């Protein structure tokens, strides 16, 4: 692999100053550097990847063993080596085929849990399961990280399909979050879902206790309006939640990959079991494509290779995710966890420090809002920010089709502007037409130059349906896997979240004045004195 990395870097240095626009002298450039899966189009032609770079990147994926590790993942081998676990979130959307874990087929158990979820969601949506004040009108999902970001993102994304109770999400331990969520709800018609695998997550259980106190005095049996997504049956029972409303999942489903199963219960309640199954089917379709398509036509592999080129080869430290769909407003936050928690590592699987940078910083906002915020830096700043646009051909509001067309035109305009830029001569000509002359023209013209040559990709699709969202999310999941394999890291642990948790537990009694601050640095002691009780 070392020779391929070196060849990629040498080639990148050779073409670094070549305008991307020059590559379009090839009339087949767009076609050759775009990939389709049914009605989904991934256009990566507006990058500086040429035929040589593409071939080297594909060789890199082969040398890294992407095929073998992909097959090992789907076969249920313990590719999460630091925790000794299989990685089988894909099984949650492929329950009609054997799923082997340590030689045992667990598919029947997955189907049973899924059927229980369907029955519960159906009964709640149809008014057969009620609150103590009548039909359930609101569902509050209490979780954090993977128990929140996925379903919260998906519920907003699929709002046009949400014909069930209103769904709300509480994650932050900041009391303002749960206060503002519950203040306008009726406890007698609200179901609270507590999503915590161990039922010990501090933020989640603190909010769950607050929600229970909110119900006490207003309903006769608060626990009767709680459900849980957890494997800790003893703790959910101690909380008072009946076993019929407890939905478990296995340790081979990582939190940030878990909304395909019981963590997605709130989504199933919102959009209904049929549309939830369409969401699963979309993910399964991407799984099949990932397993069967050759690398040169494989969307997750190509998306990952573009990411490797931009981050590890070109040195661009960030990646902007720019969905031109307001209902995908939470997608960048979801991908922040998916990508940065998975591939934000400093050591390889063998424990040695990485020779290359690991995953990029992922951020973004929906268009067109971002155009009036941070696109200034993307267009004219001194750092290159690779951009990933997502856009649908059609919206869900036929009477507002003219606005959707304006949205699409803005998306395409931004990718073209990043590619082309505006030269100094073009800026001068524009100012001259406005009557600006002399030194003032020269001064102002320089402020109107766009360097261009900024790389971007576009993922285009007909409409954001449940099945299409499933495809998109599975695409990004597999992209993370491929990048992790190429970098030689474990994408499925998250030890980086542990140290802060441990320190927070020790700091709480210091803030309460019950423990001394010996051993703390001067800054932390000062902050404890200022913020403590």
Swiss-Prot record:
Pfam families noted in UniProt: PGI
Record's keyword terms, sorted: Cytoplasm, Gluconeogenesis, Glycolysis, Isomerase
Catalysed reactions, as listed in the record: alpha-D-glucose 6-phosphate = beta-D-fructose 6-phosphate
GO BP of this protein: gluconeogenesis; glucose 6-phosphate metabolic process; glycolytic process
Protein's job: Catalyzes the reversible isomerization of glucose-6-phosphate to fructose-6-phosphate.
GO CC aspect terms: cytosol
Family: Belongs to the GPI family.
Catalytic residue positions: 341, 372, 501
InterPro entries assigned to the protein according to its UniProt record, in alphabetical order: G6P_Isomerase (IPR001672), G6P_Isomerase_C (IPR023096), Phosphoglucose_isomerase_CS (IPR018189), SIS_dom_sf (IPR046348), SIS_PGI_1 (IPR035476), SIS_PGI_2 (IPR035482)
UniProt name for this protein: Glucose-6-phosphate isomerase
Compartments in which it is found: Cytoplasm
Pathway per the UniProt entry: Carbohydrate biosynthesis; gluconeogenesis; Carbohydrate degradation; glycolysis; D-glyceraldehyde 3-phosphate and glycerone phosphate from D-glucose: step 2/4
Superkingdom as given in the UniProt entry: Bacteria
């Amino acid at each position: 692999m070392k020779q391929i990395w070196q060849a990629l870097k040498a080639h990148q240095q050779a073409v670094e100053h070549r305008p991307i626009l020059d590559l379009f002298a090839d009339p087949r450039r767009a076609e050759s550097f775009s990939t389709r899966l049914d009605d989904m189009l991934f256009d990566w032609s507006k990058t500086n990847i040429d035929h040589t770079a593409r071939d080297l990147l594909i060789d890199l994926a082969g040398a890294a063993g992407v095929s073998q590790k992909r097959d090992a993942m789907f076969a249920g081998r313990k590719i999460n080596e630091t925790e000794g676990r299989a990685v089988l979130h894909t099984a949650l959307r492929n329950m009609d085929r054997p799923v082997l874990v340590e030689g045992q087929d667990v598919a029947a158990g997955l189907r049973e849990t899924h059927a229980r979820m369907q029955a519960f969601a159906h009964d709640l949506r149809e008014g057969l399961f009620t609150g103590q004040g009548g039909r359930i009108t609101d569902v509050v999902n209490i979780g954090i990280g993977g128990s929140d970001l996925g379903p919260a993102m998906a519920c907003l994304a699929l709002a046009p399909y949400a014909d069930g109770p209103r769904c709300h999400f509480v994650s932050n331990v900041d009391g303002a979050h749960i206060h503002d969520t519950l203040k306008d709800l009726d406890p007698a018609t609200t179901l609270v879902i507590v999503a915590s695998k161990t039922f010990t997550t501090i933020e989640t259980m603190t909010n769950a206790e607050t929600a229970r106190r909110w119900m006490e005095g207003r309903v006769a049996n608060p626990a009767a309006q709680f459900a849980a997504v957890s494997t800790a049956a003893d703790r959910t029972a101690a909380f008072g939640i009946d076993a019929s409303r407890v939905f478990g999942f296995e340790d081979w489903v990582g939190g940030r990959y878990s909304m395909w199963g019981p963590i997605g219960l709130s989504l199933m309640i919102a959009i209904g079991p049929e549309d939830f199954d369409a969401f699963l089917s979309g993910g399964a379709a991407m799984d099949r494509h990932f397993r069967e398509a050759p690398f040169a036509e494989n969307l997750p592999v190509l998306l990952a290779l573009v990411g490797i080129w931009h981050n590890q080869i070109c040195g661009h430290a960030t990646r902007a995710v720019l969905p031109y769909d307001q209902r995908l407003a939470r997608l960048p936050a979801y991908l922040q966890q998916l990508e940065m928690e998975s591939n934000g590592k400093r050591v390889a699987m063998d424990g040695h420090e990485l020779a290359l940078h690991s995953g990029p910083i992922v951020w973004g906002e929906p268009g067109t809002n971002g155009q009036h915020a941070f696109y200034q830096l993307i267009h004219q700043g001194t750092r290159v920010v690779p951009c990933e646009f997502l856009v649908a051909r059609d919206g869900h509001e036929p009477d507002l089709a003219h606005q959707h067309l304006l949205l699409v035109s803005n998306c395409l305009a931004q990718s073209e502007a990043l590619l082309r830029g505006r030269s100094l001569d073009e800026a001068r000509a524009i100012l001259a037409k406005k009557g600006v002359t002399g030194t003032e023209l020269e001064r102002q013209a320089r402020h109107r130059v766009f360097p261009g040559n900024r790389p971007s990709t576009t993922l285009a699709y007909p409409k954001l349906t449940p099945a299409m969202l499933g495809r998109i999310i599975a695409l990004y999941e597999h992209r993370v896997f491929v990048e992790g394999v190429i970098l030689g890291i474990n994408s499925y642990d998250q030890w980086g979240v542990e140290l802060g948790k441990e320190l927070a537990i020790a700091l709480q009694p210091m803030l309460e004045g019950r423990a001394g601050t010996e051993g703390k640095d001067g800054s932390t002691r000062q902050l404890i004195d200022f913020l403590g009780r």
